[in-house]
UniProtKB/Swiss-Prot annotation:
GO terms for cellular component: cytoplasm; extracellular space; nucleus. One of its GO terms (molecular function) is serine-type endopeptidase inhibitor activity. This is Serpin B10. InterPro entries: Serpin_CS, Serpin_dom, Serpin_fam, Serpin_sf, Serpin_sf_1, Serpin_sf_2. Its main location: nucleus. It comes from Mus musculus (Mouse). It is found in: Nucleus; Cytoplasm. Keywords: Cytoplasm, Nucleus, Protease inhibitor, Serine protease inhibitor. Gene3D superfamilies: Alpha-1-antitrypsin, domain 1 (2.30.39.10), Antithrombin, subunit I, domain 2 (3.30.497.10). Protease inhibitor that may play a role in the regulation of protease activities during hematopoiesis and apoptosis induced by TNF. May regulate protease activities in the cytoplasm and in the nucleus.
Length: 397
């Protein structure tokens, strides 16, 4: 499972860079764990070059050319890919059980499903494996004769799975009579801060979008002992904000320069992020923190980004190999739809009843002020598995 978490986190950073190429000046928010899980469902049905490309993009491939990989990374990838598909799927099953464990101090609702044109029936073995490893049931539907109705049914199901927070995943005209197969993935997250902000301290302050433009935001504030880390080579300060019970943390990376985000995005890798956010890199400070309230609801058709990363055959009618999924030829993936919902407010990552715990013993720590008033990166991490559940860039209120 540790190897899978590393793969998901590596995919997170690579995918973030790919999205950033076509999203200059715009917010980004997605779930690498969610996307990886959804694509792994598809991967289980592939063979040949289609499977190889997916494994490489998802970072669990023993690719032929390891020359650019350090020895430890070669060994990890070889070990992870040396077994059968079932071993990888089993790791996803174990990871999901940990992340979605009943009794967790947060709410995470997911909607993962494959919809295939009914003239391409699924193998029974594939259906059984999907239920075993992912608790999922691929749906055979009539895109040819009822694509509009199918779109409504998909949106209704996703809405019900996400507590009504994501009601319209598929936009108009996103599926039609030529659609062969679509993959949908949506996530809704609600968490409560370990130390909540007081609503009475929230005031309007400027958020500097760039050197010449500011926008007013509702800026939360609190003074609390928090863990801070410095990235000297990139002139960036990092902050860890725990959620209740410390199951999850929000890791925030703020460049010192207003226009420093692009340099940070270019330089960041999974290995660097793992090093920066390790316990021995963090120091405890008495922090006067100013953090904007914000809401992000981002939708992506992932086809373009995934093709750009090298996952091309899966979208090609002449090249896609889904022979582990169906006996019919010419089945290919039409689209991948991903949508996430996030709200950062005084109580946490979406308004929820509850009270934040107070520190009972004050740590004698140096004081600093951290004003998050210009573009930054953030990650929501599951601490036990070190898996990045969500990855985001906030640069425009």
């Amino acid at each position: 499972m540790a190897s899978l978490a590393v793969s998901i986190n590596q995919f997170a950073l690579e995918f973030s860079k790919k999205l950033a190429e076509s999203a200059e000046g715009r917010n980004i928010f997605f779930s690498p764990w969610g996307i990886s899980t959804a694509l792994a469902m598809l991967y289980l049905g592939t063979k040949g070059t289609t499977a190889d490309q997916m494994a490489q993009v998802l970072q669990f491939s023993s690719v032929e050319d390891f020359k650019s990989c350090p020895d430890s990374e070669k060994k990890r990838k070889m070990e992870f890919n040396s077994g059968k598909f079932e071993e990888i799927q089993s790791d996803f099953q174990t990871l999901a059980a940990e992340i979605l464990k009943p009794g967790n101090s947060y709410v995470l609702k997911t909607a993962n499903r494959i919809y295939g044109e009914k003239t391409y029936p699924f193998h029974n073995k594939y259906l059984e494996d999907m239920k075993t490893y992912f608790g999922a049931e691929p749906q055979s539907v009539n895109f040819v004769e009822a694509s509009g109705q199918i779109r409504k049914e998909i949106n209704s199901w996703v809405g019900s799975q996400t507590g009504g927070k994501i009601p319209n995943l598929l936009p108009d005209d996103s599926v039609d009579t030529k659609t062969k197969m679509v993959l949908v993935n949506a996530l809704y997250f609600k968490g409560t801060w370990e130390h909540q902000f007081s609503v009475k301290n929230t005031t309007e302050r400027p958020f500097r979008v760039n050197k010449t433009t500011s926008k007013p935001v509702q800026m939360m504030s609190m003074k609390q002992s928090l863990q801070v880390f410095h990235i000297e080579e990139l002139q960036t300060i990092g902050l860890q904000l725990h959620y209740q019970n410390r199951d999850l943390s929000l890791l925030l990376l703020l460049p010192e320069a207003i226009d420093g985000l692009e340099q940070l995005e270019r330089a960041i890798t999974y290995e660097k992020l793992d090093k920066w956010t390790s316990a021995d890199m963090m120091d405890t400070y008495e922090v006067q923190l100013y953090l904007p309230k914000f809401k992000m609801e981002e939708s992506y058709d992932l086809k373009s980004a995934l093709r750009g990363m090298g996952m091309t055959d899966v979208f090609s009618q002449s090249k896609a190999d889904f022979s582990n999924m169906t006996s019919e030829r010419n089945l290919f993936l039409s689209n991948v739809f991903h949508k996430t919902f996030l709200e950062i407010n005084e109580e946490g990552t979406e308004a929820a009843a509850g009270t934040g715990s107070e520190i009972s013993v004050r740590i004698k720590a140096p004081s600093i002020e951290l004003n998050v008033d210009h573009p930054f990166l953030f990650f929501i991490r599951h601490n036990k598995t070190k898996s990045i559940l969500f990855c985001g860039r906030f640069c425009s209120p």
